[in-house]
Amino acid sequence: MSHEAAVLKAKEVASRVLAPSAGQNDKTGRFSTEAVESLGKSGLLGLMLPLEVGGSGLGPHTFATVTATLAEADASVAMVYLMHILGAATIMGARPSAAPTVAPILKEIAAGRHLSTLAFSEAGWPSI
């Protein structure tokens, strides 16, 4: 997938799936499973993963543009997407000895069948 194709796919997901339900999802606190499914089907969940595992092999410029496009339609989904890409990058950065375990996970991510994330906690603050 090229930069242009990724941005076009992000615009399609944003206009067709995100924008119509963003306001209602914000009001009700609903998580948009449809948005994640659309991102997976579009190939955007594997945006920065290497071609060898089925990803698009694209870089930070495309990631930033895609994320901004999603955020214009639904900031919550853009945040989920951001955390997914960072989670996938963390998995990708696993030590080489973990390669037999990591490769199948990366292939699932690139195929749009796995959503990643990260969890953060700050000392002195309760975790939810």
Where are these regions (language model features)?
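N-terminal capping segment at the start of a domain
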Residues: A14-G23
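N-terminal hydrophobic or amphipathic helices/low-complexity stretches enriched
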Residues: M1-A6, A10
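Short, flexible segments with low predicted structural confidence
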Residues: K9-E12, S42
